[in-house]
Amino acid sequence: MNKIHLLDEKTINKISAGEVVERPASIVKELIENSIDAGSKNITVEILEGGIPYIKVSDDGCGMNEIDAILAFERHATSKIKSDNDLYSIGTLGFRGEALASIAAVSHVTLQTKEEGALFGTKVVVEGGKVVEKTTCGCAKGCSIEVRDVFFNTPARRKFLKRPSTESMYIIDVVTKLCLSHPEVSFKYVKDRKLQFITSGNGNIEDVILRLFGNEVYSSLMSASFESEDLKLKILAGKNSLNYSNRNMQFFYVNGRYVKNKTLSAAVDEAFKTYIPVNRYPAVFLYMEIDPRQIDVNIHPSKLEIKFSDERRIFEAVYKTIKDSLHKYNLIPEVKIEEKKNIFEIETPTISAEQTKLYLTSSDKELEEEKKKFDNEFKGKNVFLKDNVLKENSKNSSLDNHLAVYEEYEHEKEEINKNDLAKKISDIRIVGTLFSTYIIVEKEDVFYIIDQHAAHERILYEKFTSQYEKIQTRQVTFPIVVELQPRDLELVHQEKELLNKLGYVFEEFGNNCIILREVPVILGQPEARQLFIDIVEKLKDKELINKISLKEENIIMMACKAAVKAMDNLSEKEIHKLFDDLKITENPYTCPHGRPVIIAITKTQLEKMFKRIM
């Protein structure tokens, strides 16, 4: 007897449905995408109990005639493409012609649709993949699809569905992503007969973000854009103070389609690398328009993953666009001091559907004023420091020993900024230090607290970055032997050029050992064996070694090791120097690890705490 046999049509349909319809949220996604492709301006989504017993999606799109309404339930019947050549320039959300057939194979579906100008609409009822009713009906232009009893004929699949509340969460996630992808469409979402939200459909993505995520996310957004002949980017990214433990607040859209792509994620991570702490992720809403021929969306039935023909170009465009926006905005976090309330007095905040719109994009004049804000931050009155506020303690200072090393570097900066530096030094008022770790500075009605280690780390990081191509090395008096595992030895030889650029000159010594002949000099001190081992460990951690990222990580490591530490007592001279160096850095807001360098507290906030003002 033959072991291989052909499957019947019913079984084939159920298998195919399993690829498209994973859960009720999959149905909602496919139906909304069909509505968008039909040119709808208003889409309503209604669900009951997580969408398992009932889903309805209605729209005011182009609608269908009687013949198309029947064909729509046939597998691989579509209006989106006509031949295989169209696969290379897909401009719609759907194109396979599998959605309705797959949904109808595992549920009861009722379709009502009417074209513009038609006297009557068409009603089609499909159960388990079979058309059981086809009649004319009265209905509005567009399309309305009801889906009942999902997986009624595949109990094994239904058994693996989660609780209705969990399935509802999956659905709201899908609806949210589609709302963000098409701000020109008004979405209405009704769950268990209760209206959840309505978007305006006015085409303003910032308005959609405000409606869906509230003012905290909206008010922290930075806007950036990029445009070339065949690539257009709009990115709304949250400031570094708004970050999360996962990527759930990162939304990438390519030609109107929500996608996941490692290149886009990597570009965002790299741009924010020294602005937010490790293992934290920013909020990002990224919109890309690109020639469809430069992307491949035909990778998976969900069409969630895409590939770019030129990944490097996309990475560089996204990275540079975000990085430029980070340089334009004031990123000093302001401490929010909230008054404690009796638990019985706390009111639950509500967000009105008619919220006043906040405008995100500033005028050029406002942006220029914002950029000047930090430059003028410390131009307060001349105040002489009291002798007992700061103690001269050169003997215990780790920074004092490094001043001579900066002599040449500082001379170059002074030639450019000599008068400006002198003015800044005379204008600032350093109040003192706290816990031998934090420097307190006053300026008019604001005082700033600066983490001395984070500040020095930022200064050194930018110095080392600028001098990366000409790292100073020193021959060691006695060769340093480093024993490596066989795999590590192979890796060291493979990355010899990179290690040479980082200041390490070595040769093989036998028995899985190498000899370090030259090592990098950091702040006058040779960094030898341990730093080399740390670099090798970093190399091992990389599945695909990103040379730019690795270089940056090792510069961060060197800056961290060389920077003044918490509890190091700094002299008045050293504090002035540290502060003036910080003010001319490219990013004075965070250390290379993303921790804040400086925070602000206003006089008004203090007066509220002491009840001077109410």
From Swiss-Prot:
InterPro entries in alphabetical order: DNA_mismatch_repair_CS, DNA_mismatch_repair_MutL, DNA_mismatch_S5_2-like, HATPase_C_sf, MutL/Mlh/PMS, MutL/Mlh/Pms-like, MutL_C, MutL_C_dimsub
Record carries keyword Membrane: no
Domain of life: Bacteria
This protein's UniProt keywords: DNA damage, DNA repair
GO cellular component: mismatch repair complex
CDD domains for this protein: HATPase_MutL-MLH-PMS-like, MutL_Trans
MF-aspect GO terms: ATP binding; ATP hydrolysis activity; ATP-dependent DNA damage sensor activity; mismatched DNA binding
Keyword Aminoacyl-tRNA synthetase: no
GO term, biological process aspect, one: mismatch repair
Family matches, as Pfam families: DNA_mis_repair, HATPase_c_3, MutL_C
Function (record text): This protein is involved in the repair of mismatches in DNA. It is required for dam-dependent methyl-directed DNA mismatch repair. May act as a 'molecular matchmaker', a protein that promotes the formation of a stable complex between two or more DNA-binding proteins in an ATP-dependent manner without itself being part of a final effector complex.
NCBIfam families on file: mutl
Family: Belongs to the DNA mismatch repair MutL/HexB family.
Name of this protein: DNA mismatch repair protein MutL
Native source species: Thermoanaerobacter sp. (strain X514)
